[in-house]
């Protein structure tokens, strides 16, 4: 056991992705007036909570991870960390993360983090992931919480913008996850995990990807229409979303489903990254947007 194992078991890639969306929500609410001490506390606190959830997930999934090519070398599978130590580590990470958000930000942001944590560890990892084709849908709520945490840490209000962020990122999670399930079809099938492509077929997953991307595109526009983001954000959201939709629609003609799914997955990351950046650099008050429309 080494320091490397303590880092790997937290899934750094997932933490980094969540930091981007946390920052997007935080800067959206800040509207150009950034409290960098608060920002640092929110990023670290959320990262610790996400890390805790990932370690608990590793503990829960250790019996199926060895069946999947992409997870067979995880720390728990390879015996790099004992279960008791991993559980203690996960608990300490969680306590530290929730405490930091509660004390340095506000109870609302900590509560949002708690909801995401409970959904991911309890409802998704412990239950629905192995039992239901709808596990991805429920799990998407946890993946959508980081930008909401960032937003609420500043605004201390669960308003229309927070709801929009929750809907946006939940919708984004679905085609993103379905694409992974398609190009990792053999892994999920071997582990008997009832993701949509395995349970109902790849064609059914393609249809759902198109529908969810379309819904996502419409949801992204609401930040500008609701008066929270500017026209620059709107232009980027529309361009990225429509191209992602075009790419998703191409799945009906794809000769290689795995190759197509990897492209959809890759562009999903580019899309959410671009939107997170634009939320931060082009946030506006409702009055600003209304004045722009009135000119």
UniProtKB/Swiss-Prot annotation:
Keyword set includes Ligase: no
Organism: Pseudomonas putida (strain ATCC 47054 / DSM 6125 / CFBP 8728 / NCIMB 11950 / KT2440)
Keyword annotations of the record: Cell inner membrane, Cell membrane, Heme biosynthesis, Membrane, Transferase, Transmembrane, Transmembrane helix
Pfam families: UbiA
Reaction(s) catalysed (UniProt annotation): heme b + (2E,6E)-farnesyl diphosphate + H2O = Fe(II)-heme o + diphosphate
Protein name (database record): Protoheme IX farnesyltransferase 2
GO CC terms, sorted: plasma membrane
NCBIfam families, per the entry: cyoE_ctaB, PRK04375.1-1
An MF annotation (GO) of this entry: protoheme IX farnesyltransferase activity
Miscellaneous note of the record: Carbon 2 of the heme B porphyrin ring is defined according to the Fischer nomenclature.
InterPro entries per UniProt: Protohaem_IX_farnesylTrfase, UbiA_prenyltransferase, UbiA_prenylTrfase_CS, UbiA_sf
């Amino acid at each position: 056991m080494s320091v490397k194992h303590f880092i790997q078991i937290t899934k750094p890639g997932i933490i980094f992705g969540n930091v981007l969306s946390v920052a997007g929500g935080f800067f959206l609410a800040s509207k150009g007036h950034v409290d960098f001490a608060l920002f640092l506390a929110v990023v670290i606190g959320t990262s610790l909570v996400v890390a805790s959830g990932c370690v608990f997930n590793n503990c829960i999934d250790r019996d199926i991870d060895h069946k999947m090519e992409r997870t067979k070398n995880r720390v728990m599978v390879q015996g790099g960390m004992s279960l008791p130590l991993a559980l203690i580590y996960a608990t300490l990470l969680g306590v530290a993360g929730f405490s930091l958000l509660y004390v340095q930000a506000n109870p609302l942001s900590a509560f949002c983090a708690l909801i995401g944590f409970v959904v991911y560890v309890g409802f998704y990892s412990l239950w629905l992931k192995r039992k239901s084709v709808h596990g991805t849908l429920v799990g998407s709520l946890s993946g959508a919480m980081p930008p909401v945490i960032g937003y609420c840490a500043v605004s201390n209000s669960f308003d229309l913008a927070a709801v929009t962020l929750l809907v946006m990122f939940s919708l984004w999670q679905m085609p993103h996850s379905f694409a992974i399930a398609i190009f990792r079809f053999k892994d999920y099938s071997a582990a008997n995990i009832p993701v949509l492509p395995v349970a109902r077929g790849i064609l059914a997953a393609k249809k759902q990807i198109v529908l969810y991307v379309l819904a996502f595109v419409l949801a992204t526009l609401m930040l500008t229409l609701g008066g929270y983001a500017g026209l620059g954000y709107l232009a980027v959201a529309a361009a990225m979303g429509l191209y992602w939709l075009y790419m998703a629609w191409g799945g009906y003609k794809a000769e290689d489903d795995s190759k197509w799914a990897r492209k959809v997955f890759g562009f999903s990351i580019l899309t959410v990254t671009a939107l997170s950046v634009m939320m931060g650099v082009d946030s506006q008050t409702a009055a600003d947007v209304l004045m722009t429309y009135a000119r």
